[in-house]
Amino acid sequence: MAASLRLLGAASGLRYWSRRLRPAAGSFAAVCSRSVASKTPVGFIGLGNMGNPMAKNLMKHGYPLIIYDVFPDACKEFQDAGEQVVSSPADVAEKADRIITMLPTSINAIEAYSGANGILKKVKKGSLLIDSSTIDPAVSKELAKEVEKMGAVFMDAPVSGGVGAARSGNLTFMVGGVEDEFAAAQELLGCMGSNVVYCGAVGTGQAAKICNNMLLAISMIGTAEAMNLGIRLGLDPKLLAKILNMSSGRCWSSDTYNPVPGVMDGVPSANNYQGGFGTTLMAKDLGLAQDSATSTKSPILLGSLAHQIYRMMCAKGYSKKDFSSVFQFLREEETF
């Protein structure tokens, strides 16, 4: 696999790995060029919308997996493919010294690491524990302290790119932790993402992710508002989207993940807002941004409004829909 580890100048403070060439596709095929000797089992905990395709990409690169999910049905296809399924995070830690967790909330992460049957019950010294959940940076820091007491290494590595990028192996990972361990983390994360960025100490990966998702929420609401206004002014939605995407208003929410049904194929808005990134999770991430803004005394006027909107959506029946359903919410709710 052609890849490069690029070290930018000291002024930029940015260290990242970027894959320039993707390996040929193949279902669960070992296509990574690393030596077979490096393919020791990797633990993977959390097989939801993101964790499932991430784990599959590790399999495609030849890594045997030790699997756990709180919902046994989520493990079935991996078991059918020959991967080992165990009954707790502690059992994962007993069998693997490199573990990736991908969980919905801070509470889930705390339980997976510090619970009665958590990773820390059986973690081996020298193990590398990578948490790709999006959680409170303060929780990441506390988990890192507990992991360090056990002689292991913890890194936070939340992701950006959504389900589509998870499936194609083109996620962006934002990594926080001891810099000397970055190369070890990159070996695994590079099988699931095309960009692996070192952000700094533990918690900085989460900080970067929270900032990104706050901006994403704001831009999605703005795109939905602009599209709704244009449609009500008589513009064809496809034409309006085309104009926006060749103009200064262009953004990811307008050109890659448009919230208006019928404008794009292959996005949640084309499937009654099913799949994708849930409204509940966006509300959760905006809550993390709100908490961080409060603790750092940072004004986030639009971020706070976005948080209110997504909380309102959850209360009005949109909790299981993709976060781009804010367009549908604006169309149907006229009492603002």
Curated annotation (Swiss-Prot):
The modification N6-succinyllysine is found at K60, K76, K95, K141, K149, K238, K242, K297, K321. It catalyses: 3-hydroxy-2-methylpropanoate + NAD(+) = 2-methyl-3-oxopropanoate + NADH + H(+). It is found in: Mitochondrion. It is an enzyme of class 1 (oxidoreductase). One of its GO terms (biological process) is valine catabolic process. It comes from Homo sapiens. The active site is at K209. NAD(+) binds at residues 40-68, 103-104, 108, 134, 284. Keywords: Acetylation, Branched-chain amino acid catabolism, Mitochondrion, NAD, Oxidoreductase, Transit peptide. Signal peptide: none annotated. GO terms for molecular function: 3-hydroxyisobutyrate dehydrogenase activity; NAD binding; NADP binding. This is 3-hydroxyisobutyrate dehydrogenase, mitochondrial. Pfam families: NAD_binding_11 (PF14833), NAD_binding_2 (PF03446).
